[in-house]
Curated annotation (Swiss-Prot):
Biased composition, class Low complexity, residue ranges: 148-170
GO terms under cellular component: extracellular region
Enzyme Commission number, as recorded: 3.1.1.3
Xref: InterPro entries: AB_hydrolase_fold, Lip-like_C, YSIRK_signal_dom
Catalytic reactions of this protein: a triacylglycerol + H2O = a diacylglycerol + a fatty acid + H(+)
Name of the molecule in the record: Lipase 1
Active site residues per record: 408, 600, 639
SUPFAM superfamilies tied to this protein: alpha/beta-Hydrolases
UniProt source species: Staphylococcus aureus (strain COL)
Keyword check for Zinc-finger: no
Chain residues in the propeptide: 35-290
Biological processes per GO annotation: lipid catabolic process
Amino acid sequence: MKSQNKYSIRKFSVGASSILIATLLFLSGGQAQAAEKQVNMGNSQEDTVTAQSIGDQQTRENANYQRENGVDEQQHTENLTKNLHNDKTISEENHRKTDDLNKDQLKDDKKSSLNNKNIQRDTTKNNNANPSDVNQGLEQAINDGKQSKVASQQQSKEADNSQDSNANNNLPSQSRIKEAPSLNKLDQTSQREIVNETEIEKVQPQQNNQANDKITNYNFNNEQEVKPQKDEKTLSVSDLKNNQKSPVEPTKDNDKKNGLNLLKSSAVATLPNKGTKELTAKAKDDQTNKVAKQGQYKNQDPIVLVHGFNGFTDDINPSVLAHYWGGNKMNIRQDLEENGYKAYEASISAFGSNYDRAVELYYYIKGGRVDYGAAHAAKYGHERYGKTYEGIYKDWKPGQKVHLVGHSMGGQTIRQLEELLRNGNREEIEYQKKHGGEISPLFKGNHDNMISSITTLGTPHNGTHASDLAGNEALVRQIVFDIGKMFGNKNSRVDFGLAQWGLKQKPNESYIDYVKRVKQSNLWKSKDNGFYDLTREGATDLNRKTSLNPNIVYKTYTGEATHKALNSDRQKADLNMFFPFVITGNLIGKATEKEWRENDGLVSVISSQHPFNQAYTKATDKIQKGIWQVTPTKHDWDHVDFVGQDSSDTVRTREELQDFWHHLADDLVKTEKLTDTKQA
């Protein structure tokens, strides 16, 4: 159903708009002699209908526009004839309403005596002429309009009796179209602008007369060309340059059609004056952003979720694995976003070392091609450069901070990144001095105040017996790396993050050649991987290389899903523990060191709480910087309950998981009051 819009014609304080409206309505009624001189009959017909029919103009005008590009002059003639038959009643009604609206204004403007040529010449000299200047010389145009009205009524009666004959007589010849004067071009454009004025009146009825006068301050320069605005839904009359070219040019018809189409799609023709700027500003204020900008989130600093060992983002994970952040229960990142927290899921190596993963995390946030460092690559025997990241926070620099939240090994990776940002890599600096070449900004150090908080969930800060006793066995490592080799073929979307070790088939490399090359990789005998870094020895080495930053808020969350056995001091896995962790949970539960036995299936409670060599305290409502704030252990929470990956667990509900993450995110927002360097 097409809408029937009602319009009100605005009255200007000086009467210019009312007189102009009346004149144009008279001139366009019934296609009188003045209208016959207009260029392009198809456009003249549309403008006549537009000016005469206020209530039904949308339906007939759209139909004419659809036929405009596919019909010839004969079709325009037939269309005009049909419209003349209906214009009689409509024209008389509109003329009567227009006379009533403008009765008072016409009395004030009877002193105007300039002819139409003077109007065109004056407006050409001064494009910004006041509306009062336009009033001059319109009296003659009004008289001509009245004559046109009579002629229009007579033509309408003749059209009722003999449409075909009179239609041909009323149509201007091709030669007369070419001789159309500039004033009729002005009338044609003005009719379209008058309708657009009524649209603005409908949207903003409270505009004062002064603003209306500015909006209708027209510029009828003969060299104007219609151009659409790029940033505003308004069309400036100054953009109409070069529109009125010589009527003899063969491309004139297309130019006119394009011009009228653009005028139709525009809200109103205006000049870039104060009134226009005010309207544009209001329109921009009313626009709603579909994607919240940084300032519209609760958190000023983005939250970056960093996965642990054997972690993937959905675009590169094996199909057998669940979504890392939330599993089948919920999408944690998306839920945070929907509740007003800006968050991202980092995509880094699943089996790489903490060092390699930290470098990748830096480029994931900052953007660019991963540079593991010339010295590091030479030391461990893998490629120096890795994949290229687009970057989620390209303006990341001192003073522009992020919240880093790491699950499992992700917490260690975050600590390694913070150390590199603040203190750099001495080996890389010395190597660059000796051998020359480029060095990544990450390794130069002096990049403090880029991290607001560090939060760890079930992180083995001091390593885990699971990696000591099982994960670091040669057989286990061989199986995992073989799987990585298999998924490294060029047709696989799965990415284990070991391409720097050669575990990625090249585009023009056969699979046999790829397997032979992988066998020669240094990965099989290197400690530069996640298996070693998760051992108690590897974690201790990281603890020695890292330190607490006095400008960062640290907090740890720890789970426990074991219970004491009946006849011993050993810990047994709970019934609701994630099934794949039952073996490792029982293995850790019988460790020689009793304090290490209580665990979440993969990580001992004592290892998850804080690094042994760094300061810690119990977490309270008082937020502190530069010290590990240890939250109470969450009983009956296994290693993946923090991220909701166990879909079979009925004890830990979706609502509980959602509440945990909302509380965590709200905590991060509170820390910004303490870590915001702009407020300090």
